[in-house]
Each structure stands twice: as structure tokens, then as C-alpha cells.
Amino acid sequence: MVIDIKKWDDVPNDKMKELFLENPYPLYRGTPLGTDLMKEYMFTLAKKSASINDTLVVLVDGVPMITGQFYLIPYLSKYWNIPIGGLGHIVIRNMPADINTKIIDTFSLHLSNLASNAKFVSVTIPGPNIALIRSFEQRGFAYAEGFINMVGSTNYFRDQFRLKGLVIRDLVENDFDEIDSAYKKTPFPARFVSDGGFDPEKARKLYVHRCREVYEQRLGKIFIAELEGKFAGALIGIIDKEMAETINIKTNTLSGMGIIIHSRALRRGVSMHMIEHRQDWYKSEGVDYVNFGANFNNRPMILGLDKLGFKYGSLDVALHKWI
């Protein structure tokens, strides 16, 4: 068995494509969106990113077994004034147990080394791949967050979570003070808030900053909930325009889709009502299926999504490390 370490560009394109198509990240699994067309699109995105990112491919006897990339995250680097990076586009081939550990350890070591120019780096790994998670932990990465990705049809019968007296409207400028207040008063799991290396107050404002970015750049739609005449919550909705234009599949983006409920409105059904409302909006925009990443410690959210017709798609575990 000969193990080689190469860059993406040094591996034949057909071999890299086969790795992605035969061992895809389980996006939209169990829905009509999980097609070969979607798999090819994800390969195209990874290939495009490989042209500008630091890349790594581990091969065994000339066959690509696992690949990943290191990239800097400009908006986070600018916000925190330090180089913040990510490890992504990770795809791993099913391997016999006797070679799995050695290859994974080789991969995690070399991919971690690519991040040496960053001060803080995160990696998201499919939850079932315990060996890969453990290998990154041996490199000094620690648990940050865990998410269950659930996928739901916009055609699913709803109207079961409509909360009497709740009004949902579009965001206006004056709402930002209330959003800021909600993030201060409502506990929520977030790696930049819980990690001791970041200022928690500034970390919370990062999420307010994201809402303003969506609002000012018109990246999507922000729904505001009012209950008994008071601000109750905010929810972002964004359609992946690049995917829609490239392969004619309309669905939501997989990040930047936060929801925040004000402390005075917690445990009253506001979040489910808002998600129901957003599903209706997605349907009106021609979206058939929506992905929702729920923190896997948030059992009420997961149960509520299940009642809305969302089904389990995949489990992700996020790890991070100060370099």
C-alpha cells in the first residue's frame, strides 16, 4: 500500500470527480434534491474553490481516498481582526478498517498544517465519522457545536403551529435594537460566544451584524414576529441563487439562516410559527425543499421540525482550534 499526499490540481480530474460522485456529502438525502445533478454541482463548487484554496488529497495506490481544503473566511477575519479560517469540502471514501485509521490520521495531520497561517480555524465533520473526529481532536481541535440537518417539503400540510395573536412582518430599521436586545438576553449555543478566546458581547453582535448584512445587501428576507404588540423574534430566509442559476434547483442556503427568539417570548411556540410562515414564503418563491440545521441539544426545535414534516438528513459536528 502506497500512500501519497498531493494537491487537487495534481490529481486527474476524472478521479476527483469519481470520489465526489461515489462518496458525496449527504446533502438533501432522502429527498428528490439528492440527485446526480446535485452531486455534480457540489463537485463543481469544490473544484472551483480548489483553484484558490490550499488543497489536500490523500491517495492509496493512486486512488483518491479523502480530500479537503483550507480557506480563510474574510468577513470573520475582518470582524475579529485576526485571520480566521475553515477546513472544508471534505469527502472521504468508504475504506476497509485496516487502512482507515492510518489514512485519516495522515489526512488530519496534513490538513491541519495547511491552517498554520490562521489564528483560529474550524472544521465541520459528518457526525457518523467518529474516526475523523477523534483524529482532529488529537491535533488539538475541540468540540464547538453539533447540528442535525433536517430537510422538509414546502408542500407539507401545516397550519398546526399558528399562534393566536402573533403577527409576522418584514424587518424595518428600528428592529435592529430589538434584535440586539434579544441576542443579549436569550442564551443560545454559538462557538464564538462560548469559546473563551472571543469577547462574548462582540460575538453576539456578530449575529446582529449578519441580519444587517442580509437587510442592507438584500441577500434574502428577514421575518419579524410580534406578540402582544412587542418584538418576539427574527428569522432569516435566503434562496441559493447560484444553485438556482446553475442547475435550476431552488432551495435555501446552508448557512447564515439564523433564528432568534426574545426571552419574553420563549416557549410559547413563536419559532415554529415563524418557520411555518417561512416555509410558505419559500413555497411562493418556487422552493420545494428546505434544509434546517438545528443544534442537536435543542430537542424542542427538533421535535417541532419533525411535526412540520422535516426529516433527518445528516449530522454534523463542528470542531475548532486556536493556532
Regions found by a protein language model. Name each.
Residues 102-119, 264, 273-289, 295, ...:
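Conserved acyl-CoA
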Residues 97, 269-271:
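Glycine-rich phosphate-binding loop
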Residues 21-55, 200-222:
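Active-site rim helix/loop that mediates acceptor-substrate recognition in acyltransferases
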Residues 92-174, 316-321:
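Acyl-donor-binding surface of acyltransferase catalytic domains
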Residues 9, 41-118, 233-263, 312:
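Conserved donor-binding loop and adjoining core beta-sheet/short helix segment
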Residues 122-131, 261, 291-302, 320-323:
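Conserved beta-strand-loop-alpha-helix junction that forms the acyl-donor binding cleft
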Residues 191-199:
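A short gly/proline-enriched turn/hairpin at secondary-structure junctions
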Residues 2-21, 167-190:
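A short beta-loop-alpha structural element at the N-terminal edge
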